[in-house]
Amino acid sequence: MRDRVRRIYRNVSDGLDLIVFLNSTEPHIDRSFFYATGLTDGLFEGCGAWLTPDGGCEITTSALEEEAAKKSALPLHVFRSRDDSTKLMKAALRGHKRIGINASELTYAAFERLRKLASKSARFIDISEAVVTTRLVKDAAEIERIQRACDIASRSFEEVLPFIPSGVTEAEVASELVYRMQKNGATGPSFHTIVGSGPNGAEPHYTAGSRKIEPGDMIVIDFGAAYHMYCSDITRTVVVGKASEEQRRMHETVARAQAAAFAKMKPGSTAKSVDAAARSLIDRSKYKGRFIHGLGHSIGLAVHDGGALNSTSDLVLRPNMVFTDEPGVYVPGFGGVRIEDDVLITKGEPRFMSTAPRDLREL
């Protein structure tokens, strides 16, 4: 993990002598703790990763997580009480004057604790942007885990399709999909599965309710697998029965928009130019203004892992970044279509990591 730590330091402009990733209680767990330590399981509430400029990393861990922490092969400092934790943190901070913190993931209470334990002359510097910049470019191990998460989710989607036309509820479809993903090797879902049938498909972040799926429904299914903390994020839209002309037109429009964006996902392209490729196509159709969110986001240890593909981002794409490509069209009262895939930026052509069928399936 030394290379990851060194990369973070290289992306920080300030001359820091220490970086701290400090967890609070669930859900306030900093995924960068796992990035720096290489750990892929455990909760690690109240635990910290202490990074030094030479690439070193040590962990302060509760006794509860000691066995999990040993898998990192990093130096451990184990606490069994809050007093123990305070002593270890004070020792780790001693002598350090310029300390980097991931302020976007650090609670105010945790920051105040750090501030009180550090020397009065210590200065804390927010390195959130540098952390995002570092995590945007994945290493080989990360790409392998994301690919595994994509493979699991893609396979599970195909397995669940025969289950859908049987008059089940949205929640039952979501449960079946999560079951299939875990049966196929996922360590869990990467987020709450979205199953929006009929008019519910017009809500991009609808979850999955008690509505029973009916013949003629168009269904937006947004799902992802977690594989040792790394995420996939895929969306497919299907129809129960034969698709209407309008349903087919919506799907074809979104499919063309996704393909236009995919063709632009190469090193040197800006995020906003990729977004524009999809958005301009939709806005030239009858669905102008119905694409109501950004085109995509980075994925990795988090489903939304930092960078975004949207109309205002100047982010420049680089090899080994992984983004979603997910245009959508939403018509209140009628429904929606979204097609989402996970895309690896390479030195040449982009590559779809997710392989679930993208065509409009009539179930």
Predicted feature descriptions by range:
Residues 1-363:
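Active-site neighborhoods and metal-handling regions in enzymes and metal-associated proteins
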